Amino acid sequence: MRNLLVTLADRNFLDQAKQLFSSVYWNAGWRGDYMLLAHEVPAHELQWFREKGILTREATPLFATAFKSDRLVYPVTITSKLHVFSIDFKKWDSVIFVDADCIVRYPLDALTRTKRFSAARDWLRSASLELQTHKPADMTASEYSEKFSGYNLVATVFNTGLFAFNTSILDENVFPGLEGICRKYHNLGRYPEQLWMNLYFYKRWQELPLEYNLFASYLQKKRNVPKDDIDGVVLHFPRCEDERGLRCWDKDNEFYEEWKGNLDRAELIDLKNIPKPNKRWPGARHLLSGIWKLRIALRKDYLSFYRNKLRLRTRLRGILGAPARGVHPG
């Protein structure tokens, strides 16, 4: 099988991409291909990746001029990740996308066995479809509801920081289908490409364990989980409410030394000689203990998650009538 590991970066995120590839190489022992989706990166700045044997592909955001709105939380660059659904990616059997603000600690090989499309559930504070959306002030409630006719806004959503898919899902209609969703919902997403992908793969995705997309700084800073108790296949460090110290490359972040060590070792990447991957956990007992510690730490988040679902159901009934029109039953 031919498998591909992809990340995305602009010229300001190249160190993050190097660290990501280094962690995949040294920790996961990844034996497939590596690719950088490069957004507006000068050719000479891509030379390092090419010399390492990492594939590079120029990627432009979809409808860039439409996204210069302060409604969007994230840079338009991230919309370029949708290019992985282009038909020419069928030359690989499976594709794994990992955001460059992640650290990979353990093998990703299990993801290559994905039959369709897989991702981990979004973090509990925003894990419903409605919480991925933004209703413009000049849009009425009925117009907003009509936009999402056919979707259950209470539905659980996935996070796009890591996802994997079997390229059997790719055909000539997938990328145009995503483009169509982008056009229709370009001003309605808090996290643009995440909303679009959740609409496209609505009820057609397989949930991965949270350990494939663990929000490490959130657990450590917001839920007081000791750093040494935070372990997963992939640690994710997304921006959160513009707070400092949550990104793994911030020098005051608890995971900075790990991130910096991976970045320094990027210079030693040799894709002709893949190291043995890290062993994951010493046994099932340790794994079970880790899962329960995580659930206990997130008990408030789980409670909030289910409360939000109940509140949303009640609100939708009030807006749409009971039973709700144009919305799939939960």
Regions found by a protein language model. Give the residues of each.
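Short, acidic, metal-binding catalytic loop of nucleotide-sugar glycosyltransferases
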Residues: 23-31
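Active-site-proximal specificity loops/subdomain of glycosyltransferases
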Residues: 44-90
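N-proximal low-complexity "stem/linker" segments adjacent to membrane-targeting elements
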Residues: 1-22
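Short internal beta-strands
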Residues: 33-40
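Short aromatic/hydrophobic "clamp" motif used to bind/position activated sugar donors
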Residues: 95
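Catalytic metal- and UDP-sugar-binding loop of GT-A-like glycosyltransferases, i.e.
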Residues: 98
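A glycosyltransferase accessory/donor-loop signature
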Residues: 1-3, 7, 153, 167-330
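Conserved donor-nucleotide/metal-binding helix-loop-beta segment in metal-dependent transferases, i.e.
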Residues: 102-140
